[in-house]
């Protein structure tokens, strides 16, 4: 396919760099430094390498692009504007304003073309690992004519200092996710100053140790053809995920702020903006974007997108279509009718039975755990292990990587086809809190299973007895938290999780609990299960404490207290 002319390439990059300064200046806040430096790389990625179609932003086989260092959102918004994803200059003028299509950090479901919600550093990188897992699994199950795409992620020094990046990179290397390419924005700068103030890691050696292919691109940030070559090399490599280490210069080509930490999050003032525009050779006018350049880039993006889609199956096959559809609550309840509610079980055991009984209705379910598969009830009968050699497996072994598990599940869900379910002990929800919070913000249908929900953990002692975790999760807007009391409520909780358009946390017991409810409280919010003819005290409980509350009521009744 014909490329854009060198003149259009140059002007497109100038537009991105101009917008990267103008939008934060208008908003009086924002981060232009990374966007300025990465403008050529980002333009080459979108115009020459990325498989995408602005006219079909939800095309199943599109390449996914994730900006893990989400503070550089103006870079992504400028690309979406240039490539015709529905953003216009008025949207960029409203950058970081209440209700605009261009919030301070990218938000999935809010801005067309944004795949995941990023901002807290490292989360987007781990989300990308989840998206790559989803692609690998679906390609193995349904073939490359249905699924064969890449996941591209830009991550910076801050992303790689965060602990979650270590967990997620280790998992990705172990699983040999070779459709995953990460571009390391290696500018050596943090908010406080040089990265040398706090970090001396050899990132290349670190990723090689994880099993990644590492491309040392060097200082080629202004050479479009060289950038294209390293991106294609990363795309075409097989057997390992790829890290492209690109030496960049934050704030370039500003004569005042290149390679300075002040370029990160302090909008250039009017004078500094003008001096940079003089270097770029663009007019000193806000939001400069010649219509003929924008039209040429958009037409080119549409042509590339149409060509890319023509190589793949036009429609998903029947099984994929089922995965994309919604299962009805009534059908789920029918599948669970045969569950034995006459036997006392731990609710972690009840969830295993509910999942097994409903499997035919949820072909997109993938289950996993952070090294507690059997303990938490998420070992699904008939599921085989997902691995580098068997990516068709539906049982994911995350290892002792709770934080990565949470964010990877978000990525799997936001890929758009599969429903991830992942389990660990409830006390370790603290390790996952940032990922769960972003699951709620992005409305991803991830099902978090937390067992060992109370002091019933017993002899493990206070380090493993979750006391404050329930209140912590309930405080997250958009997260559905369900703590079933018995097997009937657990079955209803499973129905609720599968029919909810967002994340759910199921809080389950280690210990056996008696069947004391009819399950209706899950649908209605609460249920009276014991009444007194002489009410004096109201006892309220949830989950495994409901049976304790009932015993307390009986004891009070024996003492004449109703």
Where are these regions (language model features)?
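Flexible, small-/acidic-enriched active-site or ligand-binding loops
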Residues: 464-467
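Conserved acidic/glycine
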Residues: 1-39, 154-155, 159-163, 181, ...
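Cofactor-binding active-site loop characterized by glycine-rich and histidine/acidic residues
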Residues: 6, 37-175, 379-380, 408, ...
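Glycine/charged-rich beta-loop-alpha catalytic/anionic-binding loops adjacent to active sites
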Residues: 15, 19-24, 54-63, 103-118, ...
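A glycine-rich helix N-cap at a beta->alpha junction
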Residues: 85-97, 172-185, 208-212, 439-458, ...
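Active-site nucleophile and cofactor-binding loops and adjacent substrate-binding regions
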Residues: 27-39, 65-71, 96, 106-127, ...
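Glycine-rich ThDP/TPP pyrophosphate-binding loop and its adjacent helix/strand module
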Residues: 54-55, 62, 110, 114-298, ...
């Amino acid at each position: 396919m014909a490329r854009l002319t060198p003149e259009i390439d140059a002007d497109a990059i100038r537009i991105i760099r101009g917008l990267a300064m103008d939008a934060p200046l208008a908003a009086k806040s924002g981060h232009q430094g990374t966007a300025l430096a990465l403008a050529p790389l980002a333009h080459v990625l979108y115009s020459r390498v990325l498989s995408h179609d602005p006219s079909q932003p939800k095309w199943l086989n599109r390449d996914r692009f994730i900006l893990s260092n989400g503070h550089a959102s103006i870079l992504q918004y400028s690309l979406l504007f240039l490539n015709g994803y529905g953003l216009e200059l008025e949207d960029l003028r409203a950058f970081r304003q209440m209700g605009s299509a261009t919030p301070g950090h990218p938000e999935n479901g809010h801005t067309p073309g944004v795949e995941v919600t990023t901002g807290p550093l490292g989360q987007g990188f781990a989300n990308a690992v989840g998206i790559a897992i989803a692609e690998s699994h679906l390609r193995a199950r349904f073939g490359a004519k249905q699924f064969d795409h890449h996941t591209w992620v830009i991550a910076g020094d801050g992303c790689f200092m965060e602990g979650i990046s270590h967990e997620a990179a280790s998992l990705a290397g172990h699983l040999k996710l070779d459709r995953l390419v990460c571009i390391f924005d290696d500018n050596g700068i943090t908010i406080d100053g040089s990265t040398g103030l706090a970090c001396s890691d050899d990132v290349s050696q670190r990723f090689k140790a994880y099993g990644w292919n590492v491309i040392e691109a060097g200082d080629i940030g202004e050479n479009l053809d060289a950038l294209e070559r390293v991106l294609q090399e990363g795309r075409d490599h097989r057997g390992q995920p790829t890290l492209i280490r690109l030496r960049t210069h934050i704030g370039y080509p500003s004569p005042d702020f290149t390679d300075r930490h002040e370029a990160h999050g302090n909008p250039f003032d009017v004078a500094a903006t003008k001096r940079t525009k003089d270097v770029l050779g663009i007019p000193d006018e806000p939001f400069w974007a010649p219509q003929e350049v924008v039209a040429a880039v958009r037409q080119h993006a549409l042509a590339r997108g149409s060509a890319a889609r023509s190589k793949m199956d036009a429609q998903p096959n029947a099984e994929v279509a089922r995965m994309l559809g919604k299962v009805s609550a009534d059908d789920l309840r029918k599948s669970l009718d045969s569950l034995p509610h006459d036997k006392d079980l731990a609710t972690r055991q009840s969830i295993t039975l509910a999942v097994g009984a409903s499997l035919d209705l949820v072909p997109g379910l993938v289950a996993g755990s952070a090294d507690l598969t059997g303990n938490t009830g998420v070992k699904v009968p008939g599921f085989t292990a997902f691995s580098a050699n068997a990516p068709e497996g539906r049982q994911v072994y995350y290892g002792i990587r709770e934080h990565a598990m949470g964010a990877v599940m978000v990525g799997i869900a936001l890929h758009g086809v599969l429903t991830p379910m992942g389990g660990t002990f409830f006390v370790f929800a603290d390790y996952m809190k940032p990922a769960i919070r972003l699951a709620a913000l992005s409305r991803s249908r991830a099902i978090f299973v937390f067992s060992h929900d109370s002091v019933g953990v017993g002899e493990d002692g206070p380090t493993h007895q979750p006391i404050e975790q329930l209140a912590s999760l309930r405080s997250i807007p958009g997260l559905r938290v369900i703590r079933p009391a018995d097997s009937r409520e657990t079955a209803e909780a499973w129905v609720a999780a599968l029919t909810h358009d967002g994340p759910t946390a199921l809080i389950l017991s280690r210990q056996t609990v008696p069947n004391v409810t009819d399950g209706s409280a899950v649908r209605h919010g609460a249920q009276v299960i014991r009444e007194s003819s002489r009410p004096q005290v109201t006892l309220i409980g949830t989950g495994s404490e409901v049976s304790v509350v009932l015993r307390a009521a009986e004891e009070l009744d024996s003492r004449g207290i109703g």
